[in-house]
Amino acid sequence: MIKIKKGLNLPIAGAPVQVIEEGPDIHYVALLGEEYVGMRPSMLVQEGDWVKKGQALFEDKKNPGVMFTAPASGKVSAINRGERRVLQSVVIEIDGDEQVPFEHYEESSLNQLSDEQVQRHLLASGLWTALRTRPFSKTPVPNSRPRAIFISAMDTQPLAADPQVIIATESEAFNHGLTILARLTEGKVHVCHAPGQAVASYQNAQVTYNEFSGPHPAGLVGTHIHFLEPVSLNKTVWHVGYQDVIAIGKLFTRGELWTDRIVSLAGPQVEQPVLLRTRLGASLSELTTGRLKEGDNRIISGSVLSGTAFSATHGYLGRFHQQVSVIREGREKELFGWVMPGRDKYSITRTTLGHFFKHKLFAFSTDMHGGERAMVPIGNYERVMPLDILATHLLRDLLAGDTDSAAALGCLELDEEDLALCTFVCPGKYEYGPVLRDILTKIEQEG
């Protein structure tokens, strides 16, 4: 077992009850284009077209054959684009349940499928896009092979669902998914889980089970990769979400695209935080109707640390998100707030009284408690960075745009979510995730 000592479990109120309930009926779903790093779409449908679930909506121009398929049947009600015609979302108004049938196999023959058969099947169904590379967090290029594949069967994000509760409902499909993923690599398939969780029921020479314990980010796949299979420009691994492993298992045994999603709906502004069964790309406004406290709320697809805020074109459950978080918009001004003791304010340093209440949960809002200022190295970053990385030096080089030094200090191992805690504890209020993405893009372009 690998024990993580550095990190932070955010003391936020509104943790969900780990019981799965049926979510509300969803009438609109969407595929969000900006979730796929570097993707350039070639549209195969137009607004007003009627599509089946599993039908291709667009193809990646940079990687021919990588199809992005509809998560539901119905009418394409909107294709939203942003600046420079960047694809933001393809919205589908759900109508019926017609779907594209896919080939399926006997359970006993799954471990005999070739790499080419598996890739072809995943590409046609759109489930290939559930895979992401490290470094760069991009959809893998067809016909490539990773050194290893990672599945994170644990989640230490604030307000997260317990993956064990979800995997237990589809354990057979999860095991079938592991069999399929093992066909894509000659290396290991690493299943990372918390201590005491019974996910190690499937025996395969390539599948290994690894226990991680400790505070967040002990559950992030970037942490697992760092300790088990560190990556570089010459070494690539893939990772995939545990619910997508279930979907892959069902695709190959049933021949249909499984688009169910069990998500945590939680946060200080949720009336009854719980796990909801919904569908991939579900409308967040429909998902949260009647479940929020009154007030000016911010709905977030994903974690409060690294998720995507609700907007007109992005108001849908993200492809890689397992939770919906809701916090209050912090628009109020506080007179002389800087001299108040701060009993209801949390800080990782001893600057507020709330720091000393070790078991108190806080109703966090979007208030940043100050504006941008100089980056001050007072040890905050090192407290929450468990990786073998010089955090302050790396963050400084990211802000300076020094690609060579940032790469030497380990930025290739990171994704935006790996620096979310550094953003949270930063006295200078810097957003390190977007800066990291810019540096990674430059490194990739420069080769």
Curated annotation (Swiss-Prot):
EC number in record: 7.2.1.1
Domain of life: Bacteria
Annotated gene: nqrA
Family, per entry: Belongs to the NqrA family.
Protein name as annotated: Na(+)-translocating NADH-quinone reductase subunit A
Principal EC category: translocase
Gene Ontology terms for molecular function: oxidoreductase activity, acting on NAD(P)H, quinone or similar compound as acceptor
Keywords: Ion transport, NAD, Sodium, Sodium transport, Translocase, Transport, Ubiquinone
UniProt keyword NAD present: yes
Subunit structure as annotated in this protein's UniProt entry: Composed of six subunits; NqrA, NqrB, NqrC, NqrD, NqrE and NqrF.
A biological process term (GO) from this entry: sodium ion transport
Function: NQR complex catalyzes the reduction of ubiquinone-1 to ubiquinol by two successive reactions, coupled with the transport of Na(+) ions from the cytoplasm to the periplasm. NqrA to NqrE are probably involved in the second step, the conversion of ubisemiquinone to ubiquinol.
Catalytic function, reaction form: a ubiquinone + n Na(+)(in) + NADH + H(+) = a ubiquinol + n Na(+)(out) + NAD(+)
